[in-house]
A protein has these predicted regions:
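Catalytic and substrate-binding regions of extracellular carbohydrate-active enzymes
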Residues: 1-157, 163
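Polysaccharide-binding surfaces and accessory modules of carbohydrate-active proteins
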Residues: 164-177
Length: 177
């Protein structure tokens, strides 16, 4: 594989991303990032309407009112994996789950990355118990996975409290094993 070129992308935070394909388990491969002229090839955007991520394998849609994942499907499959209330919802309660509260306001939904390798949407929200809540949702080219990174700028609250992120999947007759 020496000299084989792979797509690279500089992410919003300065890190580099690329997809390392066909690496057997418990093995390794060495990649080197070298500077070159900017590629003239255009990549296909994985973001639509600033609320939909689609890498050709999975499609994720963000609810603009709650910031949850309102739709989660495999491309070409009509089955909806997200329940009606949406995935990655924020739930804040007092001790013993008293006084449940959710997202107060979506401040903005913005594109962090949209390149040849990865696409990320950031949902910034006003949420109880937090100064700010950021929920980043990422898809990668050619990978059937969605990454979620939730970051809380937590308020200094001395009372008992619970913070949860809930993922109610649309599963008929779920069985816990």
């Amino acid at each position: 594989r020496t000299g084989e070129k792979v797509e690279t992308q500089r992410l919003y935070d300065g890190r580099w991303a690329f997809v390392a394909e066909n690496i057997p388990a418990l093995s390794s491969e060495v990649y080197q990032i070298v500077s070159k002229k900017k590629s003239s090839r255009r990549f296909v955007s994985m973001i639509a309407e600033n609320k939909i991520l689609n890498n050709g394998i999975v499609r994720v849609e963000i609810d603009e009112g709650k910031g949850t994942i309102s739709s989660f499907k495999r491309v070409g499959d009509s089955y909806e994996y997200a329940s009606n209330s949406g995935l990655n919802d924020y739930l804040y309660t007092g001790r013993y789950a008293s006084d449940p509260q959710g997202i107060e306001q979506i401040l903005n939904i913005r594109v962090l990355d949209d390149g040849a390798v990865a696409a990320t949407l950031r949902i910034e929200s006003k949420a109880p118990g937090c100064n700010t809540l950021w929920r980043d949702v990422t898809v990668y080219k050619g990978i059937d996975r969605v990454d979620i990174c939730n970051t809380l700028d937590k308020q200094d609250i001395l009372d008992f409290e619970n913070v949860r992120f809930v993922f109610p999947f649309n599963i008929q007759q779920p069985e816990i094993t």
